[in-house]
């Protein structure tokens, strides 16, 4: 019965109204208990008053930040560099310069390092300009638009996700006398400026450094600053700041970002080279090193105390093994004291704080554990500040907050040791080349540095003192990423409007990529589809003697040079045959001169006349040369007393020319040129010629195509970038083809003068650097300002051990590099280990192209 019910309880009836109320109360109590239980499972956050939590303010009159004791704050930014790739002498120069920072005139300071998103806004705008100037009714322009749009979208996305990152290094100094403070900052600039780009930050840049610390999740900053002091501090204040207890440790919570601060508790007295760089670039971790002059004699006092402790332990030690270890430690410490006294090293105190960030306490703890595990082998042990999380949090902040740092945080060492622990190791590349007054060519994002995760925005047309041409050398064993890297360059450069030529010996992915880019695939093993007439005269336009331009075409007489080209062409074609000697060559050249004479071209005919009056179909072909020699033979045989030796020479020449004029190779070489070079991407497919015995025909056709491309490059009337990819150029690296190798060297030396670059690539480094052609191979590589070394294995790296091409310190990396990793030399002053990062869309396309050929 609803509302009224009875139940037995000690034979007494229960009031149903009271019973109902009791049930409600029990329900409320149960609910409260569950809530309390749930609360216990949640992270408890104690909030701080934001204004009390941040120990500095803003001086509107001076337009500077200052701490609560009235000390003004100034910052000096310095650029990172990869000194690991330097020679020993260069490394020591950087180390010595850095160690000179630690002196009494500069005094106490802080070095702060943090990760920021890569600066890509300018590149995004440049991509937009290129997109806006395309004609989308043109099929090739539509393809270019898609490539540019893909690159632009990727940059926009990674700017938000911080997939592309940079590293910022700053010194922080403070003092009440602004003039003296500026002088101290100028001393840092003067000391480091000769070695790495160093400058004093203005207020806006100083503001951004501090803002990034207190707003670690911010994805963008303001375009305008507030005028009022309170407003500026309001910009800096996070929405909330609190503390989370995690056992005996505490985390600072900053707008849902959890932060834990650690400091170096133990480090080796003889630290690893550039030790601080490993800490200063350890992922998305904020690094802060405080330093200050130590008391006179502090270091020797500390070591004397250590010696006293060792002596005491030696007296207590019972076994010989322990005594022996302590004796070695005693001798080592004593030597350090004597050295410091002799050299007069200045003692300095330093301490290092690290801020670890994460979206949860668990994530922060996992990062901390990884950090502990990573650095224990380097002799570093970290500790957490107990019951002082906010104080240590602010010690990491770029404000030189010293919190009256106690001795337990500071370590005493020498200025030389601090210099040895050099922290500014970071590598990134931001290439930028002027396109028009307000626009630059967007570079190609090729990946990130392996050691520091810096971005690599690469443009081979960047001109600097140490980057004098546009040539690239690419090498790597099969399957290590060389071909995909070439495809990535070709793909992006198509979008940027390069004119690109590809000499393709493999005939696999590159011809499919050319088709994808609406380029022209020319089958150079089938004359009906792609023939280049070797007798079509090539031009070579030299520089004028005055150095003020090129020699005019009406002052160039090209037949003589072209005959020399044909001499090298025929030498390559004959291969190992020794039947053709100098007399036979002379006879063939007389026939060549004759057939050119029939169309009114001789050694006095100018290039301008030929250009104005001759088309492809007007030139002679090899069958004309063959027929001429055959006619001469008939005339000799009709003579009353024919010269038998002369007859034999003619017959040998005919036998030599017959395959190329009427035989198996006539389809390749005997006929007029029928290729169209109007496409922006042209792939000359030579793969079907690889089966030729000794690659004789392959090398000959390679040379023929190369010379034809070279003529097109130097004759190009458009002011545009051009790049020639000579894949597997090792086919011409043979002592038999010395003329071709020398021609290749000429092209790679002179191509820059025509706004063009050459990219020789190979997986057969043994063919390029073998003893018989090593001189030519090294010359080709050294003439490439940009060099990319993918994995070579033990056998491949052996060829570099007797050269200066790869530093000894990098040879092991190149030997064991993973797929897609390379050692990159960018000019003479920049080198880095790079992990190639191809965009997802392009990578999927390339993978399909690779799979389709199987």
Stretch-by-stretch model annotation:
Residues 2, 62-67, 74-82, 88-107, ...:
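P-loop NTPase motor domains
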Residues 441-526:
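Glycine-rich phosphate-binding loop of nucleotide-binding enzymes
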């Amino acid at each position: 019965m609803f509302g009224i019910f009875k139940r037995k309880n000690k034979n007494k009836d229960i009031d149903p109204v009271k019973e109902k109320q009791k049930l409600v109360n029990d329900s409320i109590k149960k609910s409260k208990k569950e809530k309390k239980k749930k609360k216990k499972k949640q992270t408890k956050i104690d909030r701080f008053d934001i204004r009390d939590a941040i120990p500095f303010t803003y001086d509107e009159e001076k337009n500077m930040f200052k701490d609560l004791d009235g000390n003004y704050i100034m910052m000096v930014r310095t650029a990172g560099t990869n000194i690991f790739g330097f020679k020993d002498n260069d490394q020591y120069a950087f180390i010595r310069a850095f160690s000179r920072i630690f002196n009494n005139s500069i005094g106490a300071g802080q070095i702060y390092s943090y990760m920021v998103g890569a600066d890509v806004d300018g590149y995004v705008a440049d991509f937009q300009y290129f997109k806006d100037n395309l004609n989308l009714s043109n099929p090739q322009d539509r393809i270019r638009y898609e490539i540019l749009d893909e690159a632009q979208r990727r940059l926009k996305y990674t700017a938000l996700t911080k997939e592309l990152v940079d590293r910022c290094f700053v010194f922080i100094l403070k003092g009440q006398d602004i003039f003296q403070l500026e002088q101290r900052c100028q001393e840092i600039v003067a000391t480091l400026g000769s070695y790495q780009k160093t400058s004093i930050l203005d207020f806006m840049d100083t503001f951004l450094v501090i803002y990034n610390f207190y707003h670690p999740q911010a994805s963008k900053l303001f375009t305008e600053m507030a005028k009022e002091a309170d407003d500026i501090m309001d910009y800096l204040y996070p929405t909330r700041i609190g503390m989370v207890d995690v056992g005996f440790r505490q985390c600072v919570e900053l707008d849902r970002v959890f932060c834990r601060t650690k400091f170096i508790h133990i480090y080796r007295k003889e630290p690893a080279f550039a030790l601080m760089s490993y800490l200063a670039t350890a992922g998305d971790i904020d690094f802060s090193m405080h330093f200050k002059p130590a008391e006179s004699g502090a270091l020797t006092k500390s070591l004397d105390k250590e010696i006293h402790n060792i002596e005491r332990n030696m007296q207590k030690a019972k076994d010989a093994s322990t005594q022996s270890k302590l004796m070695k430690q005693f001798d080592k410490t004593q030597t350090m004291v004597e050295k410091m006294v002799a050299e007069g090293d200045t003692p300095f105190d330093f301490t290092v704080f690290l801020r670890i960030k994460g979206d949860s306490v668990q994530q922060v703890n996992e990062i901390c554990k990884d950090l502990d595990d990573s650095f224990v082998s380097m002799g570093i042990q970290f500790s957490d500040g107990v019951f002082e999380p906010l104080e240590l949090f602010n010690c990491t902040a770029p404000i030189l907050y010293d919190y009256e740092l106690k001795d337990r945080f500071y370590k005493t060492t020498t200025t030389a040791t601090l210099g040895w622990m050099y922290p500014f190791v970071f590598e990134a590349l931001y290439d930028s080349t002027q396109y028009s007054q307000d626009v630059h060519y967007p570079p190609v994002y090729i990946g990130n540095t392996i050691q520091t995760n810096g971005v690599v925005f690469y443009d081979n047309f960047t001109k600097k003192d140490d980057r004098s041409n546009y040539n690239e050398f690419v090498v790597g064993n099969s399957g290590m990423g060389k071909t995909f890297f070439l495809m990535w360059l070709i793909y992006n450069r198509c979008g940027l409007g390069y004119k690109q030529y590809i000499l393709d010996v493999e005939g696999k992915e590159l011809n499919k990529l050319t088709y994808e880019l609406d380029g022209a695939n020319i089958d150079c093993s089938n004359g009906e589809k792609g023939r280049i007439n070797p007798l079509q005269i090539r031009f070579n336009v030299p520089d004028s003697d005055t150095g003020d331009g090129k020699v005019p075409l009406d002052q160039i007489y090209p037949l003589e040079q072209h005959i020399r080209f044909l001499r090298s062409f025929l030498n390559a074609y004959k291969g190992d045959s020794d039947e053709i000697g100098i007399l036979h060559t002379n006879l063939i050249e007389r026939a060549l001169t004759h057939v050119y004479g029939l169309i009114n071209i001789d050694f006095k005919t100018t290039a301008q006349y030929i250009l104005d009056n001759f088309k492809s179909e007007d030139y002679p072909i090899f069958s004309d040369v063959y027929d001429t020699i055959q006619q001469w033979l008939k005339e000799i045989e009709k003579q009353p007393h024919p010269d038998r030796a002369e007859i034999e020479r003619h017959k040998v020449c005919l036998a030599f020319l017959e395959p190329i004029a009427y035989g198996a190779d006539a389809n390749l070489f005997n006929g007029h040129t029928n290729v169209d070079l109007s496409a922006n991407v042209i792939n000359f497919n030579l793969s079907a010629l690889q089966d030729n015995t000794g690659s004789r025909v392959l090398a000959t056709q390679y040379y023929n195509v190369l010379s034809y491309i070279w003529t097109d490059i130097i004759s190009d009337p458009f002011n545009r970038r051009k790049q020639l990819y000579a894949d597997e150029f090792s086919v011409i690296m043979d002592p038999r083809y010395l003329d071709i190798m020398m021609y290749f060297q000429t092209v790679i030396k002179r191509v820059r003068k025509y706004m063009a670059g050459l990219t020789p690539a190979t997986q057969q480094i043994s063919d390029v650097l073998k003893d018989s052609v090593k001189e030519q191979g090294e010359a080709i590589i050294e003439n490439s300002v940009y060099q990319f070394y993918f994995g070579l294995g033990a056998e491949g790296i052996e060829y570099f051990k007797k050269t200066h091409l790869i530093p000894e310190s990098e040879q092991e990396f190149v030997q064991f590099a993973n797929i897609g990793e390379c050692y990159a030399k960018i000019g003479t002053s920049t080198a880095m280990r790079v992990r190639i990062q191809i965009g997802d869309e392009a990578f999927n396309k390339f993978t399909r192209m690779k799979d389709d050929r199987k």
